Design a protein with these regions (language model features):
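Charged, amphipathic alpha-helical linker segments immediately N-terminal to NTP-binding catalytic cores
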Residues: 1-25
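Residue-level signal for inorganic ion chemistry
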Residues: 17, 55, 76, 148, ...
C-alpha cells in the first residue's frame, strides 16, 4: 500500500509532468532527449537493452520478453506506454510498477537537469521525453541486468532511440500515425526501422 504522503508527492510530480509539452504534440527530433541523457551521464548505456518497435503488439512483446528474462533470473527493467490507470505502470522493475516513492525520487534526481535542458532548447522537454529519461535513470540506479524498452511512436526520432540495443525487435507494421510517419506502409516501416543499430541483432 502506498503511504498518503507518497501519493501527495506523486500527484505533485504528475502535475509537473502534465504541464510539459504533451505526448500528442509531435516535434520530431532527438536533440532534447540526447542533451538530457548526455547531461545525466548516459544511464541508458549502463546496461544491455532490447528495443521494441512496430505497430501492433509492442507492449505484449515487451511483457513476454520481461517474463522470459525473469524466468532466467535476470533483474529486468521495462518501459512501456501508454499507461491504463497509473503513470507508475510505465516504469516496471522486476515485473512490478515502480513505487510512488521511487518515481518521485527519480524525478527529483533529474529535476535540475530538466531545467537546464529546457533553458537551452527552442522547446521544453516533453512529457514523454522526461518519462523516458526517468526510466533510464531508475533502471541504472536499481540496478537492472537488462532493459526492455518500448518505442512510443515511430522509431527513428522516438525519444527512446538514444539506446545502443543488443537486440532490436520489430513487431508487425501497419498504417498508423501516417501524418508523422509516412503515407505508405513502406515509409512507416523505414521510420520504425530507425531503431536498428549496426551493432544490434534484429528480430
Amino acid at each position: 500500500m502506498t503511504a498518503p504522503d507518497d501519493l501527495e508527492l506523486l500527484r505533485a510530480v504528475e502535475d509537473s509532468l502534465n504541464k510539459r509539452w504533451p505526448e500528442a504534440k509531435i516535434d520530431p527530433t532527438l536533440d532534447r532527449i540526447a542533451a538530457l541523457v548526455d547531461a545525466l551521464g548516459s544511464p541508458q548505456l549502463s546496461y544491455p537493452t532490447i528495443h521494441i518497435g512496430g505497430t501492433n503488439g509492442k507492449t505484449t512483446t515487451s511483457r513476454m520478453i520481461d517474463a522470459l528474462m525473469a524466468k532466467l533470473d535476470y533483474r529486468t527493467g521495462r518501459f512501456t506506454s501508454p499507461h491504463l490507470e497509473s503513470v507508475l505502470e510505465r516504469i516496471s522493475i522486476k515485473g512490478a510498477p515502480i513505487s510512488a516513492s521511487g518515481f518521485v525520487a527519480t524525478y527529483n534526481d533529474i529535476a535540475l537537469y530538466l531545467d537546464l535542458i529546457d533553458s537551452r532548447q527552442p522547446h521544453p522537454l516533453s512529457f514523454f521525453e522526461v518519462l523516458t529519461a526517468m526510466a533510464f535513470v531508475a533502471f541504472a540506479e536499481f540496478p537492472i541486468d537488462i532493459g526492455i524498452i518500448e518505442v512510443g511512436m515511430g522509431g527513428e526520432w522516438d525519444s527512446t532511440n538514444v539506446l545502443s540495443p543488443s537486440v532490436s525487435v520489430i513487431t508487425p507494421i501497419g498504417m498508423d500515425h501516417a501524418a508523422y510517419l509516412g503515407n505508405t506502409v513502406e515509409e512507416i516501416a523505414r521510420t520504425k526501422a530507425g531503431i536498428i543499430k549496426p551493432e544490434s541483432h534484429v528480430v
